[in-house]
Amino acid sequence: MTTSFYFLLMALGLLLYVCQSSFGNQHTRNSDTPKYRCGSDIPNSYMDLCFRKRNDAGKKRGQASPLWQRGGSLSMLKARAKRNEAFHLQRAHRGVVEHCCKRACSNAEFMQFCGNS
């Protein structure tokens, strides 16, 4: 009886794992799903997407960014990004507000507004 109970418990656990892995992600949002970015979402998205894009090379080399090591620098950069958002987030004649606030844009579309600095 102990062996059959153990086998039943293992089969039930495996079934639960398969069901959770196949149906568990059904309602999660794709990371590149278009979304509206207005107000403080714009500089926050800038920090998340553009700053990460610039520091990926250092992470690939195994070097941690010095800004992540110092907590105060990140808040300073967020404040700077908010002040300079018009400078950093322009593309041709259309701005990021027109493109991503008035209509939804994906992460890839938003990253086109990242400055080269």
Curated annotation (Swiss-Prot):
Give the family, as the similarity comment puts it.
Belongs to the insulin family.
Extract the InterPro entries matched here.
Insulin-like, Insulin-like_sf, Insulin_CS
Prodomain residues: 25-29, 53-94, 116-117
Give start-end of the signal peptide. Answer: 1-24
Q: Which UniProt keywords apply?
A: Amidation, Carbohydrate metabolism, Cleavage on pair of basic residues, Disulfide bond, Gamma-carboxyglutamic acid, Glucose metabolism, Hormone, Hydroxylation, Secreted, Signal, Toxin
Q: What does this protein do?
A: This venom insulin facilitates prey capture by rapidly inducing hypoglycemic shock. It is one of the smallest known insulin found in nature and lacks the C-terminal segment of the B chain that, in human insulin, mediates engagement of the insulin receptor (INSR) and assembly of the hormone's hexameric storage form. Despite lacking this segment, it both binds and activates human insulin receptor (long isoform (HIR-B) OF INSR) with only a 10-fold lower potency. In vivo, intraperitoneal injection of this peptide into zebrafish lowers blood glucose with the same potency than human insulin.
Expressing tissues? Expressed by the venom gland.
Q: Which residues does the record list as 4-carboxyglutamate (modified residue)?
A: 98, 109
Instruction: Using the record for this protein, list the coiled-coil segments as residue ranges, or answer none.
Output: none
Query: What do we know about how this protein assembles, alone or with others?
Result: Heterodimer of A and B chains; disulfide-linked.
Which protein is depicted?
Answer: Con-Ins T3
Q: Which SUPFAM superfamilies does the UniProt entry name for this protein? A: Insulin-like
Location of 4-hydroxyproline modifications: 34
| Disulfide bonding pattern of the chain | 38-101, 50-114, 100-105
Alphabetized GO MF terms: hormone activity; toxin activity
Q: Where is it located?
A: Secreted
PTM sites of type Cysteine amide? 114
What is the originating organism of this protein?
Conus tulipa
**Domain of life of the organism encoding this protein:** Eukaryota
Sorted alphabetically, which Pfam families does this protein's record hold?
Answer: Insulin
GO cellular component terms, A-Z: extracellular region
Q: Name one GO biological process term.
A: glucose metabolic process
